[in-house]
Amino acid sequence: MTDRKASVCVLGGGSFGTTLANLMAAEAVPVTLWLRDPEMARHISEQHENPRYLPGIALDERLQVTTDLNAALATAEIVFLAIPSSSFRTVLQQIGPQLAGKQVVSTTKGIEPP
């Protein structure tokens, strides 16, 4: 039996995505958090805090952060979708082929407007 933990990618740097990724990082799960905002990604990487959604909450230093969607997905075995429902279709259209063979968990709430 092995203690190796599956690599995880969390797409979405809001409060829920950041919290999910941080909880996994705290348990030594190799996890990468993807978000669109380069300034926020830099801040989270350097300061270990998401000031927009989780101000004052210290994030685990093992949490990896990127704005490169392809890099985030490249080594992930499990992908959590924690993106707004308004962005869900657009993001899935970009990454659909990259999800083949991966476990995908959607944490997105709401429905996409017509």
Model-derived features: where do they sit?
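NAD(P)+-binding Rossmann beta1-loop-alpha1 motif at the extreme N-terminus of oxidoreductases
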Residues: M1-P55, V65-T67, Q94
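Rossmann-like NAD(P)(H) cofactor-binding subdomain of soluble oxidoreductases
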Residues: L59, T66-A74, I78-P114
